[in-house]
């Protein structure tokens, strides 16, 4: 199909069906941070999964999890800042309130598959941040390529299908379960809390 020549196809295996249905739509943008943010024009530096650990261990690097709060509950990288956002489009508000390009010289960002980080790093560069990095292929590519024994990832990775979460080997996780009441992924610890009410 014209325009899809450079499409990066990703395959993920599961023991059964993980989607009730599939729908394909053409949209002007997949992730929205405003019309002026175009990662095709300006984007942060891609960091291969094998090089990610060295980057995030640099004490000058501010590591930001760009995912929504319910995704972060399932797992994240050691030392990552959780901006506690409800929607990705709220990330700029967090950055404007907590980060400063003159103080925070190096920023590394990550998300599930890398799409949100392309947008967020483009936006960060437009705000004057000079060194902005993001994990190429996102968390899922990191889990696929970096052995668990060398991993800086803790917990599961929330995914947007019936699996809810996958472990470091990309197998469906028993730790994170979907709560139909709040619509979030709940860890075992959250489900064992005294205030937890099923449903």
Report the location of each language-model feature.
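Rhodanese-like catalytic fold shared by cysteine-dependent sulfurtransferases
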Residues: 1-45, 58, 68-107, 115-199
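Hydrophobic "anchor" residues on beta-strands that sit immediately upstream
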Residues: 61
């Amino acid at each position: 199909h014209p325009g899809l020549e450079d499409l990066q196809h990703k395959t993920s295996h599961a023991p059964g069906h993980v989607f009730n249905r599939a729908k394909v739509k053409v949209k002007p943008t997949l992730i929205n941070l405003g019309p002026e943010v175009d990662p095709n024009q300006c984007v942060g530096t891609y960091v291969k999964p094998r090089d990610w650990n060295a980057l995030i261990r640099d004490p000058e690097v501010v590591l930001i999890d760009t995912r929504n709060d319910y995704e972060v509950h399932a797992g994240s990288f050691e030392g990552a800042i959780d901006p506690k956002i409800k929607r990705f489009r709220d990330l700029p508000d967090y950055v404007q309130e907590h980060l400063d390009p003159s103080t925070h010289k190096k920023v590394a960002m990550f998300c599930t598959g890398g799409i949100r980080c392309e947008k967020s790093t483009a936006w960060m560069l437009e705000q004057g941040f000079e060194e902005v990095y993001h994990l190429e292929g996102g968390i899922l590519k990191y889990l696929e390529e970096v052995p668990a024994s060398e991993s800086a990832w803790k917990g599961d990775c929330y995914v947007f299908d019936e699996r809810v979460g996958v472990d470091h080997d990309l197998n469906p996780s028993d730790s994170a379960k979907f709560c139909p009441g709040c619509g979030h992924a709940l860890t075992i610890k959250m489900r064992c809390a005294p205030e937890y009410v099923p449903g």
